[in-house]
């Protein structure tokens, strides 16, 4: 099995048509006027939409290969930096910070999540906006009674 998190070109190919979060993120970015910070920016899937608004964009990620791909795609139009979303220290604050595509769930412990949120707090302007995009499933879909068969549906 191929790990798409080690192959940024493959990751981009698989996710090229994902845009379910674009409208909300661009609306909030435009409303705040930037600058914009994306955590777990990966290859910069959403950077294009922010840049198209004429806003300053910074993306952080912990993957060197994904950051290299993002820098190759956007050159000096955007800033991409190697940082862990749990503990990052940048020289500026942002009017809009977001973490999309369920990436907040890479914070595997409460401590990880708390550190991430503290780092966001440290970099968000006083009237800034922070968005976390997470899929929250219906609990009834996750719970299955033991020793009970469930019909298959298509």
Cite the ranges covered by each PLM segment.
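Conserved class I S-adenosyl-L-methionine
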Residues: 1-34, 131-154
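A short glycine-rich, Lys/Arg-flanked "PGG" loop and its adjoining helix->strand segment in the class I
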Residues: 114-126
């Amino acid at each position: 099995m191929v790990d798409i998190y080690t192959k940024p070109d493959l990751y981009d190919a698989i996710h090229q048509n994902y845009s379910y979060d674009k409208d909300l993120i661009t609306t909030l970015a435009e409303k705040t006027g930037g600058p914009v910070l994306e955590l777990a920016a990966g290859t910069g899937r959403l950077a294009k939409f922010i840049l198209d608004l004429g806003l300053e964009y910074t993306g952080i990620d912990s993957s060197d290969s994904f950051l290299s791909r993002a820098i190759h795609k956007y050159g000096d139009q955007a800033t991409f930096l190697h940082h862990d979303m749990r503990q990052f220290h940048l020289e500026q604050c942002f009017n809009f910070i977001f973490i999309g595509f369920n990436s907040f769930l890479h914070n595997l412990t409460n401590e990880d999540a708390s550190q991430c949120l503290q780092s966001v707090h440290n970099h968000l302007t006083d009237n800034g906006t922070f968005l976390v995009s997470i899929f929250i499933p219906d609990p009834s879909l996750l719970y299955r009674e033991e020793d009970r068969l469930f019909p298959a549906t298509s």
